[in-house]
Each structure stands twice: as C-alpha cells, then as structure tokens.
C-alpha cells in the first residue's frame, strides 16, 4: 500500500503495518466479533480468545509469530452470539475467567444469555449456569462488558450493559455465590451500552465511562470504598445521543494529560480533556475528529518510538492510523491494515513472538482474509520495556497504573483496556533510542505502590503485588 493512499499522511519511512499471510493455523474463522487476551492458566502464555457471532468461539495460542487454534471446549458455545468479551480473575484463583456478552445491538433482546467461563482442567464451566448464580435471577445478554475490581482485592467483577436496562456488576460474594453489586456500588443506572472505558480521568481514582449507543451516556466518578457517583451532566458530558461504539482513556497529549476518546458510528469523534476542576472540554483535533463509520479503537505504541498511535477501525471504508508528531495527532500510513472494504469489529495489540514489538490483530465480520487479520510492524529497531503487574493471587492486575521515566520523560499506561474485549494485560513501553529506564512506578487498585529503578531496556518484567509471597520482580521463565 503506497503512502499516497492516505490523504495528508506524514512521511515516516513507509507503511507501518504489514500483513501476515495465514494468520491462524488449525481452524477456519470466517467471521469474528470480539478479541480478548487472557491468562487461562498459571505461568502459561497469554491466549487470544476470539468471539464468533454464530459460533464456535475459538482459543488461539501464539506460536512462531502466528496463531494456533486449540481444540474446541465448552467455551466454543456454538449456539452463542458473541458480541463482546472481557477477561479477569473473578474468583481469586490466579487464573482469568472469560465473560462472553452475547447481545446483538441490532435486536432489542439477545438471542442467547451471557456466559462466564471458568477454566477447569482442559475445559471450562459456565458459572452463570450453576446453582451459585441462582440469586442473580435471569442473566440477559449484554452489548458491552468490562472487568472492575472495585475493592482492589484482586477479585474482579464484570460490569455489563445491555439494551437499555440497568447496568449490572456481577461479583462473587464471600460464600462463593454470585450477586449483582451495581446498586451497592452506585452503578445501577439505565443505559443502552455501546462502549466502556475505565481509568483515572477525573482524578487519581478509578472512573467509569459508559458511552450509549442510543440515549444519554454515563460517567461515574470514583468515590472510594468501592462506590461511584454519576457525574456526566455536571462534568460537561451531556451529549443527547452519542452513538458510541468504542472508547479509551488515554494520555491525550503524550505528556501526562488524561483524556477520554470516544468513537461514534455517526458524527465527529470526540476527545474530552478535564480541567483542574474536573470539567470536561471537547478538544479533538480535526485529524482525529473526522467522522467515519467507526467500529473499534486501539491505542498502543506500535513502532516503539516512545509515543502511542491511535488506530480507528472503520466499516466499509479505510481504517485510519494517527501518530503523535509535531505536538499533535497526525495521520500516517497504516499499510496493509488500511483494509478499505472490510467490516472490522475489534482490534488488539500484543507481542505474540516475544521480540518486544507488538503485532496487531483485527477481527472482522467479513472481508478479504477471513475473520482474523494479523499484522506485524515495519519500523526501525527501537528499545522497549514490558511490565506485567500481578494481583496478590498472581493474576494480571487489570486496571493498575504503570508509570515509567526514561530519558527524563514519563509515560503512563492503564493495564488491560481493550476494544470490545480484553487488551494484553502488559504495560508496553517503546523507548526509542533510550536503553535505560530511570524509574518505574506501579500503582495497584488497592493503592499499593512499588518503585523499581535503573532498569535495562529490552526485557519483560513480571511484578508481583507487594503483599504476594516472593514479591521480587522477575523475567518470565
């Protein structure tokens, strides 16, 4: 793909993303709707869970830079209608469970109830179908879902939004039963969920944005002690009909200013940045705001230059890639990931071959190459550091903040956010030409903090929670 195919693209030495031929081995996946990178076993490589709209769902393992399909299990759920995925350690055993949101935004009601798959041996069991879930009553299908550890205990709940009903926050109670804690948490508001994002938007606490596919959207400010207060109107987020499809809380100026980026199915995309009082102001530059039929969002440092890129996946029109250049978000050439005629549904980035460079996975409802597209980055060699914080139980600490200082400049990541699914639960930092990290700070959701200093680059660090036994940071075995 020539760089001239992207109007206004700045020169950076050629297209950034190159297509992998035969991305998936051992399975045909004609269509895909959601992606989740999950830790399905202790000390095992991350798996890529693929939601398939008409089943079966698949689990793929990275092998030699490609993706190898594992045998079908209960998670395949061939009669399901997967639309979104989330991954987190629900029961505190150090392994992540998978929530499958089986809602269909084109229908008032989903065809199939949601699932919560718990890895057991070589298979899975659906916790929502067991007697422990009886107190939940009927569990309808959802359109979007995110993990939420509201008490910082390492046991995550799942916050799910469906077709105009109240938000649900499904947690495991102290007796191993399941309950809906949304009312207790202050989250039981009505919404037709189209997008979710969690992070420290309005302060140091964990804030929750629920972008509505139709009707008013919600913004919950963390109030401490596992509770939230809805502040959309007072914070300046009163958009009557947002039409949200995906969202992320990101470093809006690559200098430490948090912002909320929301993609819309119609109308200009929006980037809200809070002022010192917590009032949000819309500040999307024209290059970012330009309307498109957006379906999914990815924010990651793809070329390891120390600045993140934004990939906007669009239905039936070219995908867009923006990079932070000359103190602003500028379009660059996505290369083979332009995909001008496909119908992308989700995007994820992960280091699948262990070389310190991210690969990009695009799920598609249709398009050339089937349901999964795999892309590698074509860019100059740069240094990097990858950080994998763990909960006290040893699972990925999704939602933790990781801040790095290298060459006098800081970068911050929120662990594990992803588009219509679960992102890689690793804080990936490009370092450009810098080979030494001065300082690394990790803040867990319970307020615990660890600092590591004078770290060499080009390595992955697993960082246990301070309360965990054997809490020294280490590289993967």
Cite the ranges covered by each PLM segment.
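Blade-edge motifs of beta-propeller repeat domains
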Residues: 1-31, 46-49, 58-80, 115-140, ...
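Gly/Ser/Thr/Pro-enriched helix-cap/hinge segments flanking short amphipathic alpha-helices
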Residues: 2-9, 24-28, 280-282, 290, ...
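Short coil/loop residues immediately preceding or within conserved phosphate-binding loops
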Residues: 32, 82, 111, 140-142, ...
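Beta-propeller blade termini
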Residues: 32-41, 46-47, 81-97, 141-151, ...
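Hydrophobic beta-strand segments that make up the repeating blades of beta-propeller
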Residues: 46-52, 98-102, 156-162, 206-212, ...
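Short, solvent-exposed loop/turn segments at conserved positions within beta-propeller repeat blades
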Residues: 54-55, 107-112, 162-165, 212-215, ...
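Loop/turn-rich, solvent-exposed surfaces of beta-rich toroidal or solenoidal domains
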Residues: 295-299, 303-316
């Amino acid at each position: 793909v020539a760089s001239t195919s992207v109007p206004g693209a700045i020169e950076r030495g050629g297209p950034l993303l190159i297509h992998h031929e035969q991305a998936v081995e051992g399975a045909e996946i004609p269509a895909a709707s959601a992606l989740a990178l999950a830790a399905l076993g202790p000390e095992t490589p991350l798996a890529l869970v693929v939601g398939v709209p008409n089943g079966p769902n698949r689990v793929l393992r990275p092998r030699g830079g490609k993706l190898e399909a594992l045998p079908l299990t209960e998670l395949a759920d061939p009669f399901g209608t997967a639309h979104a995925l989330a991954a987190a350690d629900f029961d505190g055993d150090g392994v992540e469970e998978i929530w499958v949101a089986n809602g269909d935004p084109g229908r008032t009601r989903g065809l199939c109830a949601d699932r919560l798959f718990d890895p057991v041996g070589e298979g899975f069991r659906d916790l929502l179908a067991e007697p422990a879930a009886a107190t939940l009553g009927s569990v309808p299908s959802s359109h979007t879902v995110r993990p939420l550890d509201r008490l910082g205990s390492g046991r995550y709940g799942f916050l799910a939004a469906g077709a105009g009903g109240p938000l649900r926050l499904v947690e495991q109670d102290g007796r191993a039963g399941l309950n809906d804690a949304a009312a207790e948490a202050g989250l039981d508001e009505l919404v037709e969920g189209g997008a979710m994002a969690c992070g420290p938007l309005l302060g140091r606490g964990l804030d929750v944005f629920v972008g509505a596919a139709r009707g008013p959207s919600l913004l919950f400010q963390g109030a401490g002690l596992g509770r939230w207060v809805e502040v959309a109107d007072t914070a300046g987020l009163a958009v009557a009909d947002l039409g949200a499809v995906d969202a992320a809380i990101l470093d809006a100026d690559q200098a430490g200013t948090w912002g909320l980026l929301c993609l819309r199915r119609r109308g200009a995309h929006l980037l809200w940045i809070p002022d010192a009082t917590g009032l949000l102001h819309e500040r999307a530059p024209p290059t970012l705001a330009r309307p498109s039929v957006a379906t999914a969002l990815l924010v990651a440092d793809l070329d390891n230059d120390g600045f993140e890129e934004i990939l906007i996946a669009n239905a039936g029109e070219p995908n867009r890639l923006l990079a932070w250049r000359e103190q602003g978000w500028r379009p660059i050439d996505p290369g083979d990931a332009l995909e001008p005629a496909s119908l992308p549904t989700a995007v994820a980035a992960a280091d699948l071959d262990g070389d310190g460079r991210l690969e990009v996975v695009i799920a598609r409802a249709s398009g050339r190459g089937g349901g999964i597209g795999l892309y590698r980055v074509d860019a100059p060699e740069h240094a990097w550091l990858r950080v994998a914080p763990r909960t006290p139980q040893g699972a990925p600490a999704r939602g933790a903040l990781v801040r790095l200082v290298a060459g006098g400049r800081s970068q911050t990541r929120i662990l594990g956010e992803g588009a219509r699914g679960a992102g890689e639960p690793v804080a990936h930092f490009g370092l450009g030409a810098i080979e030494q990290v001065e300082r690394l700070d990790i803040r867990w959701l319970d307020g615990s903090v660890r600092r590591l200093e004078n770290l060499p680059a080009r390595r992955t660090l697993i960082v246990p929670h301070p309360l965990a036994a054997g809490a020294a940071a280490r590289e993967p075995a």
